[in-house]
Amino acid sequence: MTDQAAERAPISGTTAGEISESVRNLVGTGRLRPGDAVPPIRELATELGVHRNTVAAAYRMLVAAGVAETRGRRGTVVASLPRLDGEAAANTELVDLSSGNPDPSLLPDIAAALAKLDYHPQMYGSLAVEPRLAAWARTTFTPEVDAPFEVSVTHGAVDAVERLLVAHLTRGDLVALEDPCFYASSGTVRLNGFRATPVPVDAEGLDPRALRSTLDAGARAVVITPRVHSPTGVSLTAERAREIRSVLAHYPHVLVIEDDHFSAISRHPYHRATPDTARRWALVRSVAKFLGPDLRVAVVASDPDTSERLGTRLRPGATWVSRLLQQLVVELLESDAAAGQFARARLAYAERVDTLRAELAAEGVETPFPTDGFNVWVPTPHGSAAPVAALREAGWSVRDGGPFLTPASTASPGIRITAAKLTQPQARELAQRLGAVLRSTSG
């Protein structure tokens, strides 16, 4: 349908609920399609003989339900199904610096670990959390979490964040996200009908003043990356974590989720951002970056109520995480080789990232964030599409930063470069190429 579709599709009703239901029926039958505009509030109110506040309330109900979205001057339109971005597959024809994958040579030997497992088949009704993994989690989390907690296991960090938000929020609730933001988090927020509000990130992490403003505006949850923020690579300093705790202490009802996805191989210590006053909180640690992306496991420490809510969604006999997978993960984590393996990965990624940043600096390309992990964020104030296309033509695949920016983002556009396998000669060649591209586009 065209933008005039709603004029031909009869919307009826005299109450906000009836009007909202009428529009939903039109969408359900295909008479209104994604992108179609509904009539302006005043126009529909006149047509139906109701007060414009009634129509405005109906439209708010549609937005909260995820059926419609506001488009500024375009008014209210039927919403499309949100697109949830993911990491790209490695491009074999180009030098792959876009996929976000770790270096396979720095991952442990999974086949050897499998051979050591004393696995016994688990039946319906078995424990949802592998006892050995739960014990490892308690030993690991207890020195860093000064609060009573329970242990849950989810299908990775993205799964954990989604389950936590869905367990505590309702459609239309406001969620504070870092800006720029890990695309999976913003996609999860959109997909579940929540509203994202961006909070800027600087060289020390999440801006506490902006966070306070967002919480004052009604945010009911905040997702924080304490180490190796994606895409910038920033880790919270001790002082910034203290400032964030101080702010959050005044909002004990807010759900605080810390996504510590790079934990075992980060070059920085963990600084807790969750205050003691938080009633609803979770610390999530996945294993994809240091054990391998195919091991879809995250260990979650959370307050008991949140753990119980997660448990209802990860029930034994229904949606639990495979105990075989859990046993494999804890076998790898507790192996004699683990500490050395993680230390080698930590050092290698640090050297590769630092080398790339130094080569970029030599070409006048700024990387303003102190970077941990294996990705480097390069701001491109004049847009990211042209640099991405130019590098691709020259044989380099980098990640366009667009998906990391929410609709209300104030962050600079940028590109993300995965340096996990980058050699020094490659870093120099890439820096020279990117420097030339950015100089040409800035003129």
Predicted regions and their residues:
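PLP-dependent aminotransferase class I/II
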Residues: 283-360, 367-368
